[in-house]
A protein has these predicted regions:
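Short His-Asn-centered micro-motif
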Residues: 2-4, 30-33, 153-154
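A short beta-strand-loop structural module common to alpha/beta enzyme folds
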Residues: 25-37
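A general structural motif
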Residues: 23-27, 147-149
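A short, glycine/small-residue-rich beta-strand->loop->alpha-helix junction that serves as a flexible
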Residues: 2-11, 159-163
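Secretory-pathway luminal glycosyltransferase catalytic domains
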Residues: 38-170
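Short amphipathic alpha-helix
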Residues: 12-19
Length: 170
C-alpha cells in the first residue's frame, strides 16, 4: 500500500519491487483514502511510475478500504500486515505471505527491505526528461554528467507541524 509523501512512497515502492521478486503475483495499490497524501501519488510526477488502473487494482483498493472498517474480512483471508513499530527489518515479512490478500502497510525505510532488487530500485527512481521543462532538463544533463552528484529530499511534513523539543530527544 502506497501513501504519504514522496519519500515514503519511494520506500514503499522499493518494498513492493522486493516483494514482487519473491512473489510475482504481488500488486501495488495507492491508498486513495489516506489523509496523509500531501500531493497525491507523487511517483508518477517525479519518476514516471504510473498507477496501475486495472479493474483488479480498483477492486483491491475497495477491499482495502472496506477491510479497514470491517474486521470480518479476516475470516475470508484478507489481512493487513503492519511494519513493526520500531521500524526494524523483519526478514520473515520478505517471504511469500500467507494465503489470501495481504496488504503490507508501513514506511519500509530499512534498506535491507529491498537489498534483493538494487538495480530495479535504481532504475525506478531515475529522473526522466520532461517535455517543455528546459531548465529541469538542463540540470538533468548536468547531474548525469557528474559522477559525484548527490540527491537531497527535504521532508516537507517535518516542517509543517513542528513537534515540542521533547519529541526529538532519544
Amino acid at each position: 500500500v502506497i501513501f504519504n509523501g514522496l519519500g515514503n512512497q519511494m520506500s514503499q515502492y522499493a518494498y513492493y519491487l522486493a516483494k514482487k521478486k519473491v512473489n510475482p503475483n504481488t500488486k501495488v495499490i495507492f491508498d486513495i483514502m489516506s489523509k496523509h497524501n500531501h500531493y497525491g501519488y507523487d511517483l508518477e510526477r517525479a519518476f514516471g511510475i504510473e498507477v496501475n488502473k486495472t479493474l483488479l487494482i480498483k477492486v483491491l483498493q475497495i477491499i482495502y478500504v472496506l477491510s479497514r472498517k470491517f474486521r470480518l474480512f479476516k475470516s475470508v483471508g484478507v489481512r493487513t500486515i503492519y511494519e513493526p513499530l520500531n521500524y526494524d527489518y523483519t526478514p520473515l515479512l520478505m517471504q511469500k505471505g500467507p494465503w489470501g490478500i495481504n496488504y503490507y502497510v508501513g514506511g519500509w525505510h530499512s534498506e535491507k527491505n529491498f537489498m534483493n532488487v538494487p538495480d530495479e530500485v535504481k532504475k525506478a527512481f531515475m529522473f526522466r526528461e520532461q517535455p517543455n521543462e528546459d531548465r529541469f532538463n538542463e540540470w538533468l544533463q548536468v547531474i548525469r554528467g557528474d559522477n559525484s552528484s548527490v540527491s537531497v529530499h527535504i521532508r516537507r511534513g517535518d516542517y509543517m507541524n513542528i513537534e515540542p523539543t521533547g519529541y526529538y530527544q532519544l
